[in-house]
Swiss-Prot record:
It catalyses: ATP + H2O + closed Cl(-) channel = ADP + phosphate + open Cl(-) channel; chloride(in) = chloride(out); hydrogencarbonate(in) = hydrogencarbonate(out); ATP + H2O = ADP + phosphate + H(+). Glycans are attached at residues 894, 900. Epithelial ion channel that plays an important role in the regulation of epithelial ion and water transport and fluid homeostasis. Mediates the transport of chloride ions across the cell membrane. Possesses an intrinsic ATPase activity and utilizes ATP to gate its channel; the passive flow of anions through the channel is gated by cycles of ATP binding and hydrolysis by the ATP-binding domains. The ion channel is also permeable to HCO(3)(-); selectivity depends on the extracellular chloride concentration. Binds and hydrolyzes ATP via the two cytoplasmic ABC transporter nucleotide-binding domains. The two ATP-binding domains interact with each other, forming a head-to-tail dimer. Normal ATPase activity requires interaction between the two domains. The first ABC transporter nucleotide-binding domain has no ATPase activity by itself. Residues 1386-1480 are annotated as: Interaction with GORASP2. This is Cystic fibrosis transmembrane conductance regulator. ATP 2 binds at residues 1219, 1244-1251. Residues 654-831 are annotated as: Disordered R region. The modification Phosphoserine is found at residues 549, 660, 670, 686, 700, 712, 737, 753, 768, 790, 795, 813, 1444, 1456. It comes from Nomascus leucogenys. Pfam families: ABC_membrane, ABC_tran, CFTR_R. Residues 81-365, 859-1155 form the ABC transmembrane type-1 domain. A lipid is attached at residues 524, 1395 (S-palmitoyl cysteine). Residues 99-122, 217-222, 320-339, 880-918, 1012-1013, 1117-1130 are extracellular. The gene is CFTR.
């Protein structure tokens, strides 16, 4: 960054903001970069501001029982705030004085006051000086208040972040990431620009009192008629505001539904295309959009009338003020024009300034109170440690994550045990964790000496992580004692990578020791990985380490923990993402050798680790199931250990699979069972349909108290994203950082908010910060958005001046129309993270405007209609001017004096009432035309938004995956949320305001030109100057806003990153370092924002200066060239004041339109995306309520045979595939043939291309070559018809928000009887029947109430309903329990007995059922043969599979000679037989 010119700027340069000229000049000539931005003044640095506020807040905490944050803010900023407030008041006072001078100038042209004609020139000078003084007072005052607001925001930003790092885990479990981000964005943003409004809470009443006194002098008691009307108008607008809020709240739910479906569609676009659901999803979203638009129109109409009421209230205010006085005493024109000027200022004070000031104080105090409550939350308390101790001891320790929930948990458990019925499923496999109670540890006792290894095992949710958290102090024990030295190192179950180099992530602030560093790198098997990078360990890792694989991230996290020299190492499942060989090597070299003399607590479910541990602690439901050595485990729990040991392949299973087996074993041999139970009996009981699970599931949904989730770290299924291989391990951070979780309202809420709507009961969950830290969220997590129309805070009144525009309307371009709730503004959340679609030109092109206007043909006619109405209004204005200036009337009190044609006095004789009738009639006509002129325009612009949304949705659904792969999900969702909200809410009224302001300016100039042609000559160069100044400023301002948006992203990214690694930060004591990084991010954003505010003030002040020069010219031209007659000079000066203030407003409004039109540009960019495959001849799947043929098949063979494919024979010739056009081939020359009904297994190492081949068969990639199914080539039929030939069970399960019926049959092709039949076949009937509404039960949140196994069965049911002849399965058994796995195997044998099956699977027992195997190595087919030939050790088969697969496939070669076959096979067969009599 460059050194700021502000530091050396003179007082004059600071006053006129001339120091910003270099950046404006550079931005106009070239594109600005971050290096061009000026450094911030030291007074604005986050370090200084946070230290200042933190000192005052600590003082407040120490001195009072009820500390108030506002007191700390007052001591920091109050006097500067009041200083600028006084300047603002003085500037407002000048606005009240100006009409007095205007009245004196008009009076000097009265024929009876010729003696005052000589002082008219001096009055004109005084009037011009008032404009100059107002300019010099208001702009520095407004900028100073904005500056103070910015400093307050920065200080509170830092205070909140520091507090976040200190919060206890219990508090973090109650606060969502959405609430935290909202606290930093939505609430604190109120201070930046709203602070200038705060002073009007006292300025406006003083101004009203002053104005009423001046108007009283002119009109006496009739002045209160106008004031009364303004008060009624304010109340009327408040009523409209409440009506608008009602429509907004109704509309919010509809927008939320649409965005939920849209976000799920975007996240699972590959599955949507694989299922051929594009048209079903489009129809579903468009139906929701139709309902939403009905409420959008109602809200827009109310906002329009609210805005129009202000526009046209000026006439009534003047008319009601003048009429009573005129009827009684008569009135001169001087009083009319003076009253007009007074009423303009009065109207702004009563209907705008004061209500907005009250609202600003209300919002600001509410935000301060929320922040104050947050700053007083319970903090993390480190346990009292004994630095001299060498052992780790726990004595009778009991703990709850929810304070005070112990008794509630026991009561809820007892209640549910009393309500057991016989209609449910007791299998724990389907829930993965208990749905009851809080995570709890009960009566834990153990003692480990220095240098010992304690292995902690247990089923999912048993309390293993909670145990480590209690040792770290994150979880406070409610009973018992904990003893250790306090020097702890920690490795989280889910690897956390901070932005920085690999070396920085491992050292993590600890002093560098070369020998220790190299030893750790070697022990953690990172040497080979680091050597592959050109920068070695100095390579910079992105957010969350997205450039690394899951295994690399896990090893770096482990290396970080090992590198720190500590007394106690807490390792929470560090091997989750490692293959068998790497895991074994790291355990031996690192855990057992390098750390041999250290005390270690290792959470693991691997039998090999239990054997080598000094002590073993097995947890079950929070209690100690066993504590002792491995030999004691074998002696005391022979059944437990023998069952695990009997599975020779147990150690080779994935962590999830081991957890599943361990869970079931623990259940069968729980301490609760007093009597011995045989294996067979226990197994049968475990699969018996008792109804306990069903009742628990219902209670967990229907009863919020029973739905307190159990804290457990549930490993996520590796995501398959955009056709990448199955272990691509799409990092969770990429989704969470872009789309923060939504949350309703208050800081502390129940864990589940339940919305029950009869049969369509919906259970919605949120993601707390603690969930974010543990990543224990549902895979199908969707984005809940509650979108509402933004309330127009600004009505662009033509009478308003520059200052009013600046204070009240600059926020226009930042208003969003998006909210999740009153607490969380979704637009603020979205703007917290930089949008990669912002790579559009800085200024909207004319082509965008032309395309926008021609989207809907009616828009052109509506614009013509607006022009016709405008011409009629100009004619009406000329009639009014004729009445005011050219009607010969007589004064009631001076009827004896003769007058010429320019008599300026109106009398109230009976004959003269007709003048008022004409005036009122013309004004009413003008008012009516004005009220309804913009209504067709607003209506049509909303229709344009509807059309653009439809086109964009269709374009995204039809776009090829190669295009969608290059876009972030958050960026796509921004178009459907942020940009569509702008098109719906902001753009229509902003365009209407701009057109109206522009036409008003043109009309007023035309009137003035008729009255005084010389003024028209002066107007032309002023308009040219405005246009040039706008173009000059716009280039720089848009770029600065872009840089500011980019600078905002690191702040919130750093917040999310810190929260994810908070336990690690605390364990390593790195909070100060991360506070420093946060302050750097704040300073970067401040530099951009401060420069934007400064350049904006430069622009506003230059506009004001041009206006002042113009008004000086108009004043002196009028005084010097106008003859006798008050009417002419009064009209000229009054219109001149309004012309220029309106022209300023029009210029600024055009900038707002340009800014909002960037959203239109982004929408057009999506509409112009390429379309995949051949266009279909029929794009409407529904006709007259019935499903029509979606695709017209062009192949003659298919036309003759309605049932295609009939056999399922597939021939692949020279198939090659690429992710993007021009990219590297990821599959090369793949050729093979499959006979009808044959099963083919795909084998190969991770990353060899197995899942990619399945995507290529579905034509989801850029492919070359030929594929034929039953003799029909894929080039001869349409794309969707080709995909309908396949049934798909993807690795990433897709459950969208909707009913069971919609999820199974989105096109509504099948009857309920057929759906229930398929549900019976796949074992889903009992699952569906336990929910209210059954098939009509609404699934939300990615089907959060279903287990992963249930979701896989849903996918299986879809394939059965599709009646496809070719089935593609991509890891269907990943993370499945044995029961669901056996159901899928059974269904495949029965329902797909005659189908061709292509299976990508890691479970060997499933692969052995295939007749042929396709071995893929290095993106090519290495072998395609039967299993008998592949078993030959000299074949390429053994080279193509991983070592772990080799162990599974050849168990007899890897076991001892006397060892029998794995008992897991027997278990599999017994389970399969049992399943025949068990419905799930």
């Amino acid at each position: 960054m460059q050194r700021s010119p502000l530091e050396k700027a003179s007082v004059v340069s600071k006053l006129f903001f001339s120091w910003t000229r270099p950046i404006l000049r550079k931005g106009y000539r070239q594109r600005l970069e971050l290096s061009d931005i000026y450094q911030i003044p030291s007074a604005d640095s986050a370090d200084n501001l946070s230290e200042k506020l933190e000192r005052e807040w600590d003082r407040e905490l120490a001195s009072k029982k009820n500390p108030k944050l506002i007191n700390a803010l007052r001591r920091c900023f109050f006097w500067r705030f009041m200083f600028y407030g006084i300047f603002l008041y003085l500037g407002e006072v000048t606005k009240a004085v100006q009409p007095l001078l205007l009245g004196r100038i008009i009076a000097s042209y009265d024929p009876d006051n010729k003696e005052e004609r000589s002082i008219a020139i001096y009055l004109g000078i005084g009037l011009c000086l008032l404009f100059i003084v107002r300019t010099l007072l208001l702009h520095p005052a407004i900028f100073g208040l904005h500056h103070i607001g910015m400093q307050m925001r920065i200080a509170m930003f830092s205070l909140i972040y520091k507090k976040t790092l200190k919060l206890s885990s219990r508090v973090l479990d109650k606060i969502s990431i959405g609430q935290l981000v909202s606290l930093l964005s939505n609430n604190l943003n109120k201070f930046d620009e709203g602070l200038a409004l705060a002073h009007f809470v006292w300025i406006a009443p003083l101004q009203v009192a002053l104005l009423m006194g001046l108007i009283w002098e002119l009109l006496q008691a009739s002045a209160f008629c106008g004031l009364g009307f303004l008060i009624v108008l304010a109340l009327f607008q408040a009523g409209l505001g409440r009506m608008m809020m009602k429509y907004r709240d109704q509309r919010a739910g509809k927008i939320s539904e649409r965005l939920v479906i849209t976000s799920e569609m975007i996240e699972n676009i590959q599955s949507v295309k694989a299922y051929c659901w594009e048209e079903a999803m489009e129809k579903m979203i468009e139906n929701l959009r139709q309902t939403e638009l009905k409420l959008t129109r109602k809200a827009a109409y109310v906002r329009y009338f609210n805005s129009s009421a202000f526009f046209f209230s000026g006439f009534f205010v003047v008319f009601l003020s003048v009429l009573p006085y005129a009827l009684i005493k008569g009135i001169v024109l001087r009083k009319i024009f003076t009253t007009i000027s007074f009423c303009i200022v009065l109207r702004m004070a009563v209907t705008r300034q004061f209500p907005w000031a009250v609202q600003t104080w209300y919002d600001s105090l509410g935000a301060i109170n929320k922040i104050q409550d947050f700053l007083q939350k319970q903090e993390y308390k480190t346990l009292e440690y004994n630095l001299t101790t060498t052992e780790v001891v726990m004595e009778n320790v009991t703990a709850f994550w929810e304070e005070g929930f112990g008794e509630l948990f026991e009561k809820a458990k007892q209640n549910n045990n009393n309500r057991k019925t016989s209609n449910g499923d007791d299998s724990l496999f389907f829930s993965n964790f208990s749905l009851l109670g809080t995570p709890v540890l009960k009566d834990i006792n153990f003692k480990i000496e220095r240098g010992q290894l304690l292995a902690v095992a247990g089923s999912t949710g048993a309390g293993k992580t909670s145990l480590l958290m209690m040792i770290m102090g994150e979880l406070e024990p409610s009973e018992g004692k904990i003893k250790h030295s306090g020097r702890i190192s920690f490795c989280s179950q889910f690897s956390w990578i901070m932005p920085g180099t690999i070396k920085e992530n491992i050292i993590f602030g600890v002093s560098y020791d070369e020998y220790r560093y190299r030893s750790v790198i070697k022990a953690c098997q990172l040497e080979e990985d680091i050597s592959k990078f050109a920068e070695k360990d100095n390579i910079v890792l992105g957010e969350g380490g997205i450039t690394l694989s899951g295994g690399q991230r896990a090893r770096i996290s482990l290396a970080r923990a090992v590198y720190k020299d500590a007394d106690l190492y807490l390792l929470d499942s560090p091997f989750g993402y490692l293959d068998v060989l790497t895991e074994k090597e790291i355990f031996e070299s690192c855990i057992c050798k390098l750390m041999a003399n250290k005390t270690r607590i290792l959470v693991t479910s691997k039998m090999e680790h239990l054997k080598k541990a000094d002590k073993i602690l097995i947890l079950h439901e929070g209690s100690s199931y066993f504590y002792g050595t491995f030999s004691e485990l074998q002696n005391l729990r022979p059944d437990f250990s023998s069952k695990l040991m009997g599975c020779d392949s147990f150690d080779q299973f994935s962590a999830e699979r081991r957890n599943s087996i361990l869970t079931e074993t623990l259940r069968r041999f729980s301490l609760e069972g007093d009597a011995p139970v045989s294996w067979t009996e226990t197994k049968k009981q475990s699969f018996k349909q008792t109804g306990e699970f069903g009742e628990k599931r219902k209670n967990s949904i229907l009863n919020p108290i029973n739905s307190i989730r159990k804290f457990s770290i549930v490993p996520k299924t590796p995501l398959q994203m955009n056709g990448i291989e199955e272990d691509s391990d799409e990092p969770l951070e990429r989704r969470l950082s872009l789309v923060p979780d939504s949350e309703q309202g208050e800081a502390i809420l129940p864990h589940i908010s339940v919305i029950s709507t009869g049969p369509t009961l919906q259970a919605r969950r949120r993601q707390s910060v603690l969930n974010l830290m543990t990543h224990s969220i549902n895979q199908g997590q969707s984005i809940h958005r509650k979108t509402t129309a933004s309330t127009r805070k600004v009505s662009l009144a033509p009478q308003a001046n520059l200052t009013e525009l600046d204070i009240y309307s600059r926020r226009l371009s930042q208003e969003t129309g998006l909210e999740i709730s009153e607490e969380i503004n979704e637009e603020d959340l979205k703007e917290c993270f930089f949008d990669d679609m912002e790579s559009i030109p800085a200024v909207t092109t004319w082509n965008t405007y032309l395309r926008y206007i021609t989207v809907h043909k009616s828009l052109i006619f509506v614009l013509i209609w607006c022009l016709v109405i405008f011409l009629a209004e100009v004619a009406a204005s000329l009639v009014v001017l004729w009445l005011l200036g050219n009607t010969p009337l007589q004064d009631k009190g001076n009827s004896t004096h003769s007058r010429n044609n320019s008599y300026a006095v109106i009398i109230t004789s009976t004959s003269s009432y007709y003048v008022f009738y004409i005036y009122v009639g013309v004004a009413d006509t003008l008012l009516a035309m004005g009220f309804f002129r913009g209504l067709p325009l607003v209506h049509t612009l909303i229709t344009v938004s509807k059309i653009l949304h439809h086109k964009m949705l269709h374009s995204v659904l039809q776009a090829p995956m190669s295009t969608l792969n290059t876009l972030k999900a958050g960026g796509i969702l921004n178009r459907f949320s942020k940009d569509i909200a702008i098109l719906d809410d902001l753009l229509p009224l902003t365009i209407f305001d701009f057109i109206q302001l522009l036409l008003i300016v043109i009309g007023a100039i035309a009137v003035v030109a008729v009255l005084q042609p010389y003024i028209f000559v002066a107007t032309v160069p002023v308009i040219v100057a405005f246009i040039m100044l706008r173009a000059y400023f716009l280039q720089t301002s848009q770029q600065l806003k872009q840089l500011e948006s980019e600078g905002r992203s690191p702040i919130f990214t750093h917040l999310v990153t810190s929260l994810k690694g908070l336990w690690t930060l605390r364990a390593f004591g790195r909070q100060p370092y991360f506070e420093t990084l946060f302050h750097k991010a704040l300073n970067l954003h401040t530099a951009n924002w401060f420069l934007y505010l400064s350049t904006l003030r430069w622009f506003q002040m230059r506009i004001e200066m041009i206006f002042v020069m113009f008004f000086i010219a108009v004043t002196f031209i009028s005084i010097l060239t106008t003859g006798e007659g008050e009417g002419r000079i009064g009209i000229i000066l009054t219109l001149a004041m309004n012309i220029m203030s309106t022209l300023q407003w029009a210029v600024n409004s055009s900038i707002d339109v340009d800014s909002l039109m960037r959203s239109v540009s982004r929408v057009f960019k999506f509409i112009d995306m390429p379309t995949e495959g051949k266009p279909t001849k029929s794009t409407k799947p529904y006709k007259n309520g019935q499903l029509s043929k979606v695709m017209i098949i062009e192949n003659s063979h298919v036309k003759k045979d309605d049932i295609w494919p009939s056999g399922g024979q597939m021939t692949v010739k020279d198939l090659s595939a690429k992710y993007t056009e021009g990219g590297n081939a990821i599959l090369e020359n793949i050729s093979f043939s499959i006979s009808p009904g044959q099963r083919v297994g795909l084998l190969g190492r991770t990353g060899s291309g197995k899942s990619t081949l399945l995507s290529a068969l579905l034509r989801l990639l850029n492919t070359e070559g030929e594929i034929q199914i039953d003799g029909v080539s894929w080039d001869s039929i349409t794309l969707q018809q080709w995909r309908k030939a396949f049934g798909v069970i993807p690795q990433k399960v897709f459950i969208f928000s909707g009913t069971f019926r919609k999820n199974l049959d989105p096109y509504e092709q099948w009857s309920d009887q057929e759906i229930w039949k398929v549900a019976d076949e796949v074992g889903l009937r009992s699952v569906i029947e336990q929910f209210p509404g059954k098939l009509d039960f609404v699934l939300v949140d990615g089907g959060c109430v279903l287990s992963h196994g249930h979701k896989q069965l849903m996918c299986l049911a879809r394939s059965v309903l599709s009646k496809a002849k070719i089935l593609l399965l991509d890891e269907p058994s990943a993370h499945l329990d044995p029961v669901t796995y056996q159901i899928i195997r059974r269904t495949l044998k029965q329902a797909f007995a005659d189908c061709t099956v292509i299976l990508c699977e890691h479970r060997i027992e499933a692969m052995l059922e295939c007749q042929q195997f396709l071995v893929i190595e290095e993106n090519k087919v290495r072998q395609y043969d039967s299993i008998q030939k592949l078993l030959n050790e000299r074949s390429l088969f053994r080279q193509a599979i991983s070592p772990s697969d080799r162990v599974k496939l050849f168990p007899h070669r890897n076991s001892s000679k006397g060892k029998s076959q794995p008992q897991i096979a027997a278990l599999k067969e017994e389970t399969e037989e049992e399943v025949q009599d068990t419905r799930l």
